């Protein structure tokens, strides 16, 4: 792997569970899915550990360097105007002050995919 390709500023919307489930549906590769389960769980938990400012189970986008532009990148919608009025909340692992509906919808759906993966693979 090329370490210059790593982006430590932010992550992207949580779609890994969906992707793994789609791979499983096509390949029936249970070994691959079983290998991915702990990684999927760790990634899902990461959101609540590092991107839930007030611990109310609703996450916010953010960045590791404290920049608003990197927090916007985390959404996958880099220049979306909906983030223009947002602020970085200091002391919060640099999350923005908005609980985005899309992010929390992705996380809810990820829970469903984790359930499917853990129970059917």
Where are these regions (language model features)?
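The feature captures the catalytic groove of carbohydrate-active enzymes
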Residues: 2-25, 30-34, 38, 45-121
């Amino acid at each position: 792997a090329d370490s210059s390709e790593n982006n430590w500023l932010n992550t992207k919307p949580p779609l890994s569970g969906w992707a793994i489930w789609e791979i499983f549906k096509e390949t029936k590769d249970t070994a691959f899915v079983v290998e991915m389960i702990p990684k999927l769980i760790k990634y899902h938990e990461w959101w609540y550990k590092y991107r839930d400012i007030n611990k109310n189970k609703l996450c916010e986008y953010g960045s590791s360097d404290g920049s608003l532009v990197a927090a916007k990148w985390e959404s996958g919608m880099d220049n979306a105007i909906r983030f223009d009025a947002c602020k970085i909340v200091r002391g919060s692992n640099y999350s923005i002050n908005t609980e985005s509906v899309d992010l929390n919808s992705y996380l809810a759906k990820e829970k469903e995919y984790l359930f499917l993966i853990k129970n059917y693979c």
